[in-house]
């Protein structure tokens, strides 16, 4: 069940974008890198089942290795993740996966479930679309970091592989980078002397 319209998603993504930037130290200001990431993202987005011009790619200025997407086509990778990628195909694999989440509207599904929990089915019948977006924004800016279901991750992988292939990248790069992220997460956990708390992309 998705309670948000396409316009609600764009509005919500724009609202949360400002919160994301503040939380992660802002956008990375190395224009050459941000232009490069945007170029790779647009190359992939041209093959997605979603208007390519609605995607917005941002490199966040943090060494944390992570990537995620917001409703409305907002996609984020950290400079730590870009540094970990060994080649363009691995970076493309991450971006393609996040584009898959946007195309399948997984964030909108997650926000809708949260709204159902918070407001109750009876109240939802009287809520307008614009009110829905406003209420969801008030739930806080942490929903985007919560994990997707296994089925959603599988769907994002499937779509991502499709976009990688159509754009001329090696689809195997997605799996190789996932393995690299796992190794990095285990190493960081050992340095901290605790369990691995790294969020999966």
List the predicted regions and their residue ranges.
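A Zn2+-metalloprotease active-site environment signal
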Residues: 1-201
């Amino acid at each position: 069940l998705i309670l948000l319209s396409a316009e609600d998603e764009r509005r919500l993504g724009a609202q949360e974008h400002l919160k994301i930037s503040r939380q992660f130290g802002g956008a990375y200001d190395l224009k050459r890198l941000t232009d490069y990431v945007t170029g790779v993202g647009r190359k992939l987005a041209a093959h997605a089942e979603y208007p390519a011009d609605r995607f917005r790619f941002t490199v966040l200025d943090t060494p944390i290795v992570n990537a995620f997407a917001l409703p409305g086509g907002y996609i984020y990778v950290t400079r730590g993740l870009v540094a970990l990628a060994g080649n363009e195909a691995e970076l493309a694999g991450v971006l393609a996966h996040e584009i898959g989440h946007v195309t399948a509207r997984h964030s909108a599904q997650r926000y809708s479930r949260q709204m159902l929990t918070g407001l109750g089915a009876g109240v939802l019948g009287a809520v307008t679309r614009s009110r829905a977006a406003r209420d969801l924004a008030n739930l806080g800016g942490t929903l985007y970091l919560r994990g997707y279901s296994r089925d959603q991750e599988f769907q994002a992988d499937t779509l991502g592989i499709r976009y990688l292939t159509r754009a001329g990248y090696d689809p195997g790069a997605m799996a190789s980078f996932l393995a690299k992220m796992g190794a990095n997460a285990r190493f960081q956990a050992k340095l901290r002397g605790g369990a691995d708390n790294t969020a999966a992309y």
